């Protein structure tokens, strides 16, 4: 068992650094300790980049923000880091919306689209837990986040000022404490309290902090707190007595009474000025619309201390000047934290693009009287603001982009040697003429040895036609592109991994996360058509899909040796020489990563569940309700959420077709899956 203890972190792993990992870890640690603001880790597919970063975190001892460009990869990183750091605060911060339709207005159609959303309570709890851990003073905090971390949050100073500290023996009036809970947006629920709720039984107040699952019991004796206990709200079992407790706000946007009063006054003043401006331009409809909406929001803020869309008034609530950047998750970190940007060639451009899209949509809302101009300041960070905020950054990618190379000064830390000894697959360029027949021969050669193939085409139509041709020639093939629903994509991937099909044809197979050990052949048709999916980085990324197999081989069909192809050939040759030399020096024989069918089914079980569920639902098997109940009990929380999402789309389609009975039936099924998901999630 390998481990590192010290600097507040405890890293635990069943394996130790191998290959290029020790050298990469040493160089990254030296860079952080030297004060380098930007570093780039170039790690080939399968080289163990996450383990390298975990060693870096353990050795430098700083709070860490790990950024990923989508929720799925963020969840994977969160799971891996929790395993590496079981005793430390590994937190998860992504958008808490299961569904989100932003507020928008389409002037050409004179159509207003109201904000529509559905919040995932568990993710909201995890977000609050992340901010709570950061403000608790702990140094051993790792937050895994999507780009949600650059969007507006409440002020950390105000949020921290609202925290309630409780200790046995301290003087505190019971009624005053209840008022404080309500001001922090806790809700009284004497029947079924959960996170962010409390119940009152005489001098005993039970509450579940918004970021926790266990409850706190506060017992009063006269004007003071007699005792604090932690207990399980479901079973009632007391788990222990506490010497103190901190109650954090139940929402990200909180404001004290005085701050709220100043904010409402500022909103009134801005509204008056904007109404004069609109009326002066004879835009009476816009003026009336803005006045009605804003006054309604002000009334809600006055009565409840909150309103729907309160984030649009965040500039006034925080007392910021026009144009000032909003507070975000980065402000909750101490000054010396470390940022790790995973898949930086995608994540950094995504960060850079967030501001423009958000401002374009909100400018239209402001122009047509749906929002005050201050709503423009409820926005994600601009890229220059992001760069100015982050103290030290480590970019991680198999194909670093221009941005990270520029900020790193062109200096990169390479991790080219895999612990498994696998080499980058050889790349061969072949002429376009006769490419299909040649490809057919290669496919048969590889599938005869029990391996699989990935084929990249230029268009969706080409992928469908090629798949049809392969089927006619006896090749077990499927096509995969953006028009195929997510659950069906998962089922297709499962079929590839379990041996039901041998070939996958698609346009952009990069986004599928196809790190499949069974794939030994990657073929790219029309590789000389320069563009987004035929540039150097895309070609290197797709070639890496064959890097987990010792028989990996890449074919580029091209008549012209473009700059991108030359760079791929040169870089692959360079890497193979380094990897081969290391293997010879250490006597390593490359071996493919092999997974059992059981492991494959575990990772793609949601597709299997979808198939079984549909059979039961359409009466292909007896007693569907009994069997459905049995099926649901076998699913994980993630699988249940995926099933619920699939059914929700069908429910919406049924409602649009006025098939209300079917929609109601689907609604009930969704409720079952969501209930099971919540139960399964508690067992994680």
UniProtKB/Swiss-Prot annotation:
GO terms for biological process: nucleotide-excision repair; SOS response. A motif (Beta-hairpin) lies at residues 96-119. Residues 435-601 form the Helicase C-terminal domain. One of its GO terms (cellular component) is excinuclease repair complex. GO terms for molecular function: ATP binding; ATP hydrolysis activity; DNA binding; excinuclease ABC activity; helicase activity. Coiled coil: none annotated. InterPro entries: Helicase/UvrB_N, Helicase_ATP-bd, Helicase_C-like, P-loop_NTPase, UVR_dom, UVR_dom_sf, UvrB, UvrB_inter. ATP binds at residues 43-50. Keywords: ATP-binding, Cytoplasm, DNA damage, DNA excision, DNA repair, Excision nuclease, Helicase, Hydrolase, Nucleotide-binding, SOS response. It holds the Pfam family Helicase_C. Residues 641-676 form the UVR domain. Residues 30-188 form the Helicase ATP-binding domain. HAMAP family: UvrB. Forms a heterotetramer with UvrA during the search for lesions. Interacts with UvrC in an incision complex. The beta-hairpin motif is involved in DNA binding. NCBIfam families: PRK05298.1, uvrb. The UvrABC repair system catalyzes the recognition and processing of DNA lesions. A damage recognition complex composed of 2 UvrA and 2 UvrB subunits scans DNA for abnormalities. Upon binding of the UvrA(2)B(2) complex to a putative damaged site, the DNA wraps around one UvrB monomer. DNA wrap is dependent on ATP binding by UvrB and probably causes local melting of the DNA helix, facilitating insertion of UvrB beta-hairpin between the DNA strands. Then UvrB probes one DNA strand for the presence of a lesion. This is UvrABC system protein B. It comes from Chlorobium limicola (strain DSM 245 / NBRC 103803 / 6330). The gene is uvrB.
């Amino acid at each position: 068992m390998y481990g590192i203890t010290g600097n507040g972190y405890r890293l635990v792993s069943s394996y130790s650094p191998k290959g290029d990992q020790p050298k990469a870890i040493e160089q990254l640690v030296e860079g952080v300790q030297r004060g380098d603001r930007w570093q780039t880790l170039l790690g080939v597919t399968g080289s163990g980049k996450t383990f390298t970063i975990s060693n870096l975190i353990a050795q430098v001892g700083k709070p860490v923000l790990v950024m990923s460009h989508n929720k799925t990869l963020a969840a994977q990183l969160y799971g891996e880091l929790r395993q590496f750091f079981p005793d430390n605060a590994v937190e998860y911060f992504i958008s808490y919306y299961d569904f989100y339709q932003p507020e928008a207005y389409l002037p050409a159609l004179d159509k207003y689209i109201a904000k529509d959303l559905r919040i995932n309570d568990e993710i909201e709890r995890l977000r609050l837990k992340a901010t709570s851990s950061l403000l608790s003073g702990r140094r051993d905090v790792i937050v895994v986040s999507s780009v949600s971390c650059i969007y507006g949050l409440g002020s950390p100073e105000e949020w921290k000022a609202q925290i309630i500290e409780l200790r046995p023996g301290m003087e505190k009036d019971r009624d005053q404490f209840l008022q404080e809970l309500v001001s922090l947006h806790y809700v009284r629920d004497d029947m079924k309290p959960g996170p962010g709720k409390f119940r009152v039984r005489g001098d005993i107040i039970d509450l579940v902090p918004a970021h926790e699952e266990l409850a706190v019991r506060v017992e009063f004796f006269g004007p003071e707190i007699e005792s604090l206990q932690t207990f399980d709200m479901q079973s009632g079992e007391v788990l222990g007595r506490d010497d103190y407790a901190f109650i954090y706000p139940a929402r990200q946007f909180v404001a004290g009474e005085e701050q709220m009063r100043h904010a409402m006054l500022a909103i009134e003043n801005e509204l008056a000025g904007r109404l004069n401006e609109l009326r002066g331009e004879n835009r009476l409809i816009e003026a009336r619309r803005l006045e009605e909406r804003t006054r309604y929001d002000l009334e809600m803020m006055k009565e409840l201390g909150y309103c729907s869309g309160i984030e649009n008034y965040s500039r006034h609530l925080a007392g910021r000047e026009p144009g000032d950047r909003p507070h975000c998750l980065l402000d909750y970190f101490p000054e010396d934290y470390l940022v790790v940007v995973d898949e930086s060639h995608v994540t950094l451009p995504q960060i850079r693009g967030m501001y423009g899209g958000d401002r374009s949509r909100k400018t239209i809302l402001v122009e047509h009287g749906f929002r005050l101009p201050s709503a423009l300041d409820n926005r994600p960070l601009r890229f220059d603001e992001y760069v100015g905020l982050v103290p030290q950054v480590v970019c991680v990618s198999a194909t670093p982009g221009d941005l990270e190379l520029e900020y790193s000064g062109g200096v990169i830390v390479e991790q080219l040697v895999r612990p498994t000894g696998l080499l980058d697959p050889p790349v061969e360029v072949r002429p376009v003429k006769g490419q299909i027949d040649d490809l057919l021969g290669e496919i048969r050669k590889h599938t005869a040895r029990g391996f699989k193939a990935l084929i990249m085409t230029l268009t969706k139509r080409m992928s469908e036609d090629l798949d049809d041709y392969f089927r006619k020639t006896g090749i077990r093939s499927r096509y995969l592109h953006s028009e195929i629903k997510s659950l069906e994509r998962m089922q297709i991937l499962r079929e590839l991994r379990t041996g039901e099909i041998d070939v996958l044809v698609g346009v952009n197979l990069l986004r599928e996360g196809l790190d499949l050990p069974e794939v030994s052949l990657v073929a790219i048709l029309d590789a000389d058509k320069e563009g987004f999916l035929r540039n150097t980085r895309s070609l290197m990324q797709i070639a890496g899909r064959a890097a987990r197999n010792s028989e990996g081989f890449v074919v580029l069909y091209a008549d012209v040796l473009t700059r991108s192809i030359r760079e791929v050939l040169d870089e692959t040759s360079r890497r193979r020489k380094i990897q081969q030399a290391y293997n010879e020096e250490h006597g390593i024989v490359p071996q493919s990563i092999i997974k059992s069918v059981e492991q494959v089914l575990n990772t793609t079980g949601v597709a299997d569940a979808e198939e079984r569920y549909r059979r039961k639902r359409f009466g292909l098997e007896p007693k569907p309700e009994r069997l459905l109940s049995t099926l649901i009990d076998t699913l994980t929380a993630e699988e249940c959420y995926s099933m619920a999402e699939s059914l929700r789309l069908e429910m919406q389609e049924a409602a649009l077709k006025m098939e209300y009975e079917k929609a109601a039936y689907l609604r009930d099924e969704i409720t079952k899956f969501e209930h099971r998901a919540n139960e399964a999630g508690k067992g994680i």
